[in-house]
Amino acid sequence: MSSREELGVAVAGLGAIGKALANRLARNEVAGCRLSAVSGRDPGRTADFIASLPRPVPAVPLHELPRHADIVVECAPAAVLPQIVEPVLDAGKKVIVLSVGALLEFPELFRKAGSSDGQILVPTGALLGLDAVTAAAEGRIESVKMVSRKPPIGFKGAPILAERNLDIDGLTEPLLLYSGSARAAARGFPANLNVAVALSLAGIGPDETQLEVWADPGVVRNTHTIEVVSDAALLRMTIENIPSENPKTGRITAQSVMAMLRKMSAPVRVGT
């Protein structure tokens, strides 16, 4: 029998991804991990969701999650990221961040992580080949470029649309929404481009990572094409993700968190 202690996992945010994660954890689908708490914006809906689980867990405010868990998974709107991450780091625990783009808007979180016993974890998510990019970064990376294409509905509400007075309703051909650095893109598409920021953090940084963003009525899946030129390898990758209930993100995002949690409690770990 294994002597490893079971890890308590709390889920912050009960949107499509948060609910999917909480459901799977509550059903003991990750050996060595259990759902220990949740936090949702609407008390009534949160209570209804908890009632649907095979066993009840407490619903607590964001800042109390570290008291109930070893690991907190952030699945919330980007604006509340500090409210989730700071208490976890102060408690010396781990937080898995899905709103990766928001990390660039709150650089103090990097500093706090560096001065605490806690840790910020960024899952692979939709980014095929993230391990290869981090390995390439141990040498010299010359350039990183990503081209993202999503159905227009996936960009609804993106701040850059209002800033540039862009109308994507009724598009009949691809429209270039943005071309530039990953850092600036994260501001314009806070709910859409976490994959680009994760790529930049793994490689040469958000200012040097180049990005094109297209609203494309001809695609039905979120599609990312990546090219990394380094002294160790030339990497070319294309990923087509099936959207989740939230068209801004892919179904594989929740599965990536499950895989990360599984690695953390597994006797054998595969991958960087």
Curated annotation (Swiss-Prot):
It comes from the Bacteria. NAD(+) binds at A126, N194. GO terms for biological process: NAD biosynthetic process. It catalyses: L-aspartate + NADP(+) + H2O = oxaloacetate + NH4(+) + NADPH + H(+); L-aspartate + NAD(+) + H2O = oxaloacetate + NH4(+) + NADH + H(+). SUPFAM superfamilies: Glyceraldehyde-3-phosphate dehydrogenase-like, C-terminal domain (SSF55347), NAD(P)-binding Rossmann-fold domains (SSF51735). One of its GO terms (molecular function) is NAD binding. The keyword 4Fe-4S does not apply. It holds the Pfam family NAD_binding_3. The active site is at H224. InterPro entries: Asp/hSer_DH_NAD-bd, Asp_DH, Asp_DH_prok, L-Asp_DH, NAD(P)-bd_dom_sf. Its EC number is 1.4.1.21. Keywords: NAD, NADP, Oxidoreductase, Pyridine nucleotide biosynthesis. Pathway: Cofactor biosynthesis; NAD(+) biosynthesis; iminoaspartate from L-aspartate (dehydrogenase route): step 1/1. Specifically catalyzes the NAD or NADP-dependent dehydrogenation of L-aspartate to iminoaspartate. NCBIfam families: PRK13302.1 (NF009825). PANTHER family: ASPARTATE DEHYDROGENASE DOMAIN-CONTAINING PROTEIN, L-ASPARTATE DEHYDROGENASE-RELATED. The iminoaspartate product is unstable in aqueous solution and can decompose to oxaloacetate and ammonia. Belongs to the L-aspartate dehydrogenase family. This is L-aspartate dehydrogenase 3. It comes from Bordetella bronchiseptica (strain ATCC BAA-588 / NCTC 13252 / RB50) (Alcaligenes bronchisepticus). The gene is nadX3.
